Amino acid sequence: KNAKLFVNSPNALEGNKTENTANAAFQSSEAGMVDVVAQEDELLESIRTLVSILPANNEDDMSYSECTDDLNRACTDLEASAADPALSLPMISDDNFFFEVKKDYAKDMVTGFIRLNGNTIGAIANRTALYDEEGKEAETFDGTLSAEGAEKAAEFVNFCDAFSIPVLTLTNVTGYKATKCQEKRIAKAAAKLIYAFHDMTAPKVNVIVGAANGTASLAMNNSADMTYAWPQATIGMMDPVSAAKIMYADEIAKADDKNALISEKAAAYAKLQASAESAAKRGYVDSIIAPETTRQIAAAAFEMLFTKREDRPAKKHGTV
């Protein structure tokens, strides 16, 4: 926590009078350069944990361990905790193990490692709420994909693929964050995330736990080997309310009770076009699963994909 990291010394930065850009807090939460911030004893323990779960290389199998947890264990509280993946991912993992990386940076996107059937799995999830140690809501997010979140996830995907670590995603995204600052970076950041997932040769499993709306959903592991959805998930080009307002603009303008008509049309659109059932009928998802069976289904999917091999044509590298 007392370490310093910088390219230019804080007092050498033009216009900077007060902010210490070299301390661990800044490099962790603002720059995204630091994976873990802790005191020395905690940091050493984190390193030991990482060494024990990460393979030595992309062909190493020494990171696998015997699973003592029930693979069919029901995650009864998973749906209630879905807003904060820092709570829901441990429920899916063997013995509630979860090692989060870059937890202070781009908090709308959660990245870390879990264990399934004794195997190390990279986990990526959208966050809409952050809860403190007392279980109280400390911070909320709007469900959109930010440039920082996309970059954070893309770097994590590349790391996992370098070691052939499978990746599980819990998708809940409504669109891209819409601000002038984000507009400068979001296109390139989203492209990097989409490319990272498509370029990945290790097993990929996607579980849509909430919304998968618009082109932002394409960035969240759209190229997964197996895709599942919870029954209440909404999957489509836009959220049902926005779609209803566009499609029935003339009717809404003439209606006496506009809100009632919007709700009616949105519900009809959601059932016909944006429900998990309609997505399954179109082949967008492989199966609709109950939230409490997520651990069981994910473990089975990764077991099936364990021997996945993907041959690539001889070339140098992509340009994204």
Task: Give the residues covered by each predicted segment.
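Ligand-binding clefts of soluble mixed alpha/beta catalytic domains
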Residues: K1-V320
